[in-house]
Amino acid sequence: MAGFAAAVFLGLMLTGCQGTQKAEQSGYKVFCRNAEATALREVQYEPEAEGGEKLVEELLSAMEGTFNRNDYQSVFPEGLTAAVSTLKDGRLTIDFNDAYKQMDDTREVLLRAAVVQTMTQITDVREVVFTVAGEALLNSENQAVGPMHASSFINSEGDSINAYQ
């Protein structure tokens, strides 16, 4: 019985550690929203670019329009565009156009979670900062959101929305 419990514990530990590894060797998981627009869904993606800003741009482009099917869709609403501002010392800054301000709260949280979780798989990216039309992204209390990490979001399976911590 103790051996079985130890095996289960080891299995859980190994499964839990998988999420912290970078995925450059075997492609990337690009996050999109489920058909109900209540949670994120992973789609495997094999980029052509190998790293740095070129890879960020390719993944952003894929997120903006590639993933529209019956069971999942892009987290980017129509009209929203994103561009890399800087990638320096592990901090990626992405600038969005003014269409960002038109999103409802649910869509905005899903977009943030999807972009951050997709980009932080890149070895060069530790954290992601959003700007809108060149200005810092502000929360509902008019405070700058600041750097976000994959761990900033609760990754829940099923029909519940992924939450921002």
Label every model-predicted segment:
Residues M1-G11, T15-Q165:
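Bimodal "functional hotspot" detector
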